[in-house]
């Protein structure tokens, strides 16, 4: 089949020739951790997790992801230890098993997992819709507008 519109958080797709895009939201990033492995009781900050492994999904853009995680942690005064894993599921399982923490976004399904908690971070990433340039369907523009309003009001 042919997709009319794709929802993505992948920034590289926005630069593909023949693709149009619209940002619909900025998703807040969070630091996901296992409550059983919290560094201490009470109020936590990202700095409290400086000794943890930061699990990230490895791939061809591993340098980009590593730099991204480092830039997210820099305002908190530390450089994270990065531990690549092969998939998002492996990253979540790693957090669940106490192997480290993960930077994800506020829409992650893992946030509702019993035994997990998260800290809001001073960082966001864009959620975008993309479609082929040849699709000049006004319904796509209307969909973008409706989706932006829906997300904003959620």
For each feature predicted by the language model, list its residue ranges.
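Short beta-strand-centered segments that line the small-molecule binding cleft or hinge
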Residues: 1-29, 33, 91, 96-99, ...
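Secondary-structure junction motif
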Residues: 52-76, 141
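Short beta-strand-to-loop elements that line the ligand-binding cleft
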Residues: 78-87
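Short secondary-structure boundary segments
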Residues: 9-12, 35, 105-108, 133
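Flexible hinge/capping segments at coil-to-helix
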Residues: 16-54, 138-141
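Conserved glycosyltransferase catalytic-site signature
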Residues: 66-67, 87-89
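A late-sequence structural motif
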Residues: 117-154
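A generic "structured core" feature
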Residues: 80, 98-106
């Amino acid at each position: 089949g042919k997709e009319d519109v794709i929802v993505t958080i992948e920034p590289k797709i926005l630069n593909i020739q023949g693709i149009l895009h619209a940002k619909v939201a900025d998703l807040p990033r969070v630091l996901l951790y296992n409550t059983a492995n919290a560094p201490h009781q009470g109020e936590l900050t990202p700095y409290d997790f400086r000794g943890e492994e930061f699990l990230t999904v490895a791939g061809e853009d591993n340098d980009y992801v590593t730099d991204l995680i480092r830039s997210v942690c820099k305002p908190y005064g530390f450089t994270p230890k990065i531990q690549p894993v092969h998939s998002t599921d492996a990253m979540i399982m790693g957090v669940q098993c106490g192997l480290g923490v993960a930077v994800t976004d506020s829409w992650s399904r893992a946030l509702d997992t019993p035994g997990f908690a998260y800290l809001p971070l001073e960082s966001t990433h864009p959620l975008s819709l993309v479609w082929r340039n040849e699709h000049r369907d006004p319904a796509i523009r209307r969909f973008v507008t409706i989706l932006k309003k829906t997300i904003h009001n959620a």
